Amino acid sequence: MDSLINEIKSAQSSAELEELRIKALGKKGILTAQFALLKNLDEEEKKEKAKELNQLKGEFEREWTLKKEIIATEELHKKLLEEKVDMTLFAPSKGVGSAHPVMITMERIVDYFVSLNFAIKSGPLIEDDFHNFEALNLPKYHPARDMQDTFYFKDGMLLRTHTSPVQIRTMEKETPPIRMICPGAVFRRDYDLTHTPMFHQVEGLVVEEEGKVSFANLKYILEDFLRFMFGEVQVRFRTSFFPFTEPSAEVDISCIFCHGEGCRVCSHTGWLEVLGCGLVDENVFKAVGYKNVSGYAFGLGVERFAMLIHAVSDLRAFFESDLRVLEQFR
């Protein structure tokens, strides 16, 4: 037994200790074998021998437990030293995600109008003909429908070609005054340097009692908005046509690249077209059951703004998932 105790004291690892435990108390261990022999003794001898063996077993277990705690502490300390981290070392760089340039631009646009208490509204991407066309003064066979190549489903439903249906759905549910914007994805069958089948719009609508809203209000807010987005630019309004507004206008800003002098980007005109607007047509109000109201609406392409802000000539670069391109906009 003294030999086992000495071996415990000289053990250097948990593995050595475990071997000693098995040697003493395992199925074929020294003490286990001694306990098995007790059955061959008479009662008096068995009692004396059992007492002696229990004392030896207790001594072994105390020494073994004490040594186990010492070795466990030493092994933990050694492990911590081996696995310690030098906080002064440079960590390997990891790729960090960032917002997409189109989403950054959309958020900036939305932030401006939210600051003026415009509510943000949303609607379904799959629309019916009424909300996408008819309610917006575009009845069946109207020639203006040719302006938008539409994705149709077999049941007559379609992918919305603009976010204007959200305005119709909002007016169906709410009564004036209305002050809203509807940012979101839209879809048209077009794909070239300046068009993709899916892109994003932000449209706005203001409806008040008749006589409370004029083109002057629309002009003021859009001029302020465009200077918020592009800095101190000149803004001009050109008469145009949209089925859902009357009168209608296209809005241009002085070229932010040549400052109005004329360059390739602005086709040497000194102006960049950025959005469309107008006073809401009476037929649109009739479609939603509004009477004695007036209002204005406007709409812009988010990608168009992003292209101008970041000087990108090919719209498709935003959607081709080329990290070499997208990393430039962090």
Swiss-Prot record:
Look up the record and name the cofactor or cofactors this protein needs.
Mg(2+)
Its annotated compartments are: Cytoplasm
User: Keywords in UniProt for this one?
Assistant: Aminoacyl-tRNA synthetase, ATP-binding, Cytoplasm, Ligase, Magnesium, Metal-binding, Nucleotide-binding, Protein biosynthesis
**Molecular function (GO) terms listed?**
ATP binding; magnesium ion binding; phenylalanine-tRNA ligase activity; tRNA binding
One GO biological-process annotation of the entry reads: phenylalanyl-tRNA aminoacylation
The protein's matches in InterPro entries, at most eight in alphabetical order, are given as: aa-tRNA-synth_II, aa-tRNA-synth_II/BPL/LPL, Phe-tRNA-synth_IIc_asu, Phe-tRNA_ligase_II_N, Phe_tRNA_ligase_alpha1_bac, Phenylalanyl-tRNA_Synthase, tRNA-bd_arm
Which reaction(s) does the protein catalyse, per the Swiss-Prot or TrEMBL entry?
tRNA(Phe) + L-phenylalanine + ATP = L-phenylalanyl-tRNA(Phe) + AMP + diphosphate + H(+)
Report the Pfam families cross-referenced here: Phe_tRNA-synt_N, tRNA-synt_2d
Residues bound to Mg(2+): E246
State the PROSITE patterns in the record. Answer: AA_TRNA_LIGASE_II (PS50862)
- Provide the Gene Ontology terms for cellular component: cytoplasm
Record text on cofactor binding: Binds 2 magnesium ions per tetramer.
Q: What class of enzyme is it?
A: ligase
* The EC number(s) this enzyme carries: 6.1.1.20
UniProt lists the family membership as follows: Belongs to the class-II aminoacyl-tRNA synthetase family. Phe-tRNA synthetase alpha subunit type 1 subfamily.
Q: How does it assemble?
A: Tetramer of two alpha and two beta subunits.
State what protein this is by name: Phenylalanine--tRNA ligase alpha subunit
Which species does this protein come from? Wolinella succinogenes (strain ATCC 29543 / DSM 1740 / CCUG 13145 / JCM 31913 / LMG 7466 / NCTC 11488 / FDC 602W)
